């Protein structure tokens, strides 16, 4: 079964790579990105100049310029569907990242766990979680911690507060600032700098985790049971993923109400491609560059979420078998479909993981 899963994860990674890079390259998306970079202006903002210096390193600044152009339409809010897709992506990644970090801390010592966390985080920022997350699960598909040892080597040392605080400070807080509209609430100059600085969030995450481990948490490592700490981390990831998915789902329903009733109350939603990922193309009012970003984000998030769901479902089934519990596959499929619709794919993966952790749940799955 592990070998089959490994091939599934690798297939997902290759699919993501093809759709995010090869297909978009053939469709001219990266040429559009290069052309926009050559204009030295931000997308949709002909009067706002693109910053040319962020770190003082010319090669690195060139990469950051492309990244700022990439993230500007998503964070600025001109295109509602694109921004909502970015919101769903960002919130969903919190749940996925919590699952990955907890798994890393569970099977490694704190130092090695932080090194691996840093490598995985930088890799996913460089090429996208849609490629890196399936590859990570493919490489670690055999590394399952024993059910009897529920505490995490890394998380036990840093507590749930270390993981949650690190995620809030390194990822969520800069993301909120980055999403403020310019120039209404933040200057375009500052917004570009925040977008560039946010790209290093995996580094900030590891630094905050290490600081918490070394200086803050030494005096109260046993303040909560290990299992409760793990569940707190999962609940945090679930809440972030679910809330962002519900925001997107509400906008989707509103846009469909508008299209059916021809009401003018939701006119601002319908033209911007608020659609189920992968099924619909962005609407006609999206520019070519924004349409490419829409497609890139959809494949990046959906493949990462699908890989995490496959891994979580396999983990859940393995734990049920270990507890000698029978699984009603038809009922499980129906529950998964309902959770995916209401909670979102990332939150569904987190829900499966936390339910597989509790012996009390395994003894009474109803």
UniProtKB/Swiss-Prot annotation:
Keywords: Isomerase, Membrane, Transmembrane, Transmembrane helix
Recorded topology in the membrane: Multi-pass membrane protein
EC class (word): isomerase
Intracellular or extracellular location(s): Membrane
GO molecular function, a single term: isomerase activity
EC number: 5.4.99.-
A cellular component annotation (GO) from this entry: membrane
Record field: transmembrane: 9-29, 84-104, 113-133, 162-182, 195-215, 233-253, 291-311, 333-353
Induction trigger: The onset of expression occurs at 48-hour-old stationary cultures and the steady-state levels correlates with the onset of aflatrem biosynthesis at 108 hours.
Primary localisation category: membrane
Keyword Membrane in annotation: yes
Keyword presence, Transmembrane helix: yes
Family designation: Belongs to the membrane-bound ascI terpene cyclase family.
Role this protein plays: Aflatrem synthesis protein A; part of the ATM2 gene cluster that mediates the biosynthesis of aflatrem, a tremorgenic mycotoxin with acute neurotoxic effects. Synthesis of geranylgeranyl diphosphate (GGPP) by AtmG (a GGPP synthase) precedes condensation of GGPP with indole 3-glycerol phosphate, followed by epoxidation and cyclization by AtmM (a FAD-dependent monooxygenase) and AtmC (a prenyltransferase) to produce paspaline. AtmB is also essential for paspaline production, but its exact role has not been identified yet.
Protein name: Terpene cyclase atmA
Organism of provenance: Aspergillus flavus
């Amino acid at each position: 079964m592990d070998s089959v899963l490994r091939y599934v994860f690798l297939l997902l990674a290759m699919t993501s790579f093809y759709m995010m890079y090869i297909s978009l390259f053939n469709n001219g998306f990266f040429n559009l990105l290069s052309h926009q970079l050559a204009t030295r202006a931000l997308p949709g903002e002909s009067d706002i100049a693109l910053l040319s210096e962020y770190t003082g390193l010319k090669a690195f600044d060139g990469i950051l310029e492309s990244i700022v152009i990439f993230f500007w339409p998503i964070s600025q809010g001109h295109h509602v569907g694109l921004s909502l897709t970015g919101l769903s992506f960002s919130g969903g990644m919190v749940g996925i990242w919590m699952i990955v970090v907890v798994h890393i801390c569970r099977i490694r010592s704190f130092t090695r766990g932080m090194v691996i966390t840093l490598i995985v985080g930088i890799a996913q920022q460089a090429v996208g979680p849609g490629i890196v997350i399936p590859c990570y699960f493919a490489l670690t598909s055999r590394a399952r911690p024993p059910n009897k040892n529920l505490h995490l080597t890394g998380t036990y040392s840093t507590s749930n507060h270390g993981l949650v605080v690190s995620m809030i400070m390194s990822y969520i807080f800069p993301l909120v600032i980055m999403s403020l509209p310019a120039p209404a609430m933040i200057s375009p100059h500052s917004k570009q700098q925040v977008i560039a600085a946010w790209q290093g969030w995996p580094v900030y995450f590891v630094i905050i985790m290490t600081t918490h481990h070394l200086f803050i948490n030494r005096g109260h490592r046993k303040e909560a049971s290990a299992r409760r700490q793990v569940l707190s981390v999962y609940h945090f990831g679930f809440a972030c993923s679910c809330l962002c998915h519900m925001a997107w789902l509400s906008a989707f329903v509103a846009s469909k109400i508008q299209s059916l009733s021809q009401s003018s109350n939701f006119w601002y939603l319908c033209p911007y491609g608020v659609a189920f990922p992968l099924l619909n193309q962005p609407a006609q009012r999206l520019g070519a560059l924004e349409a490419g970003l829409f497609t890139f984000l959809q494949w990046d998030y959906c493949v990462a979420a699908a890989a995490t769901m496959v891994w979580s479902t396999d983990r859940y089934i393995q734990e049920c078998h270990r507890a000698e519990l029978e699984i009603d596959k038809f009922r499980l499929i129906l529950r998964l479909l309902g959770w995916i619709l209401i909670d979102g794919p990332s939150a569904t993966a987190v829900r499966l993981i936390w339910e597989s952790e509790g012996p009390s749940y395994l003894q009474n799955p109803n």
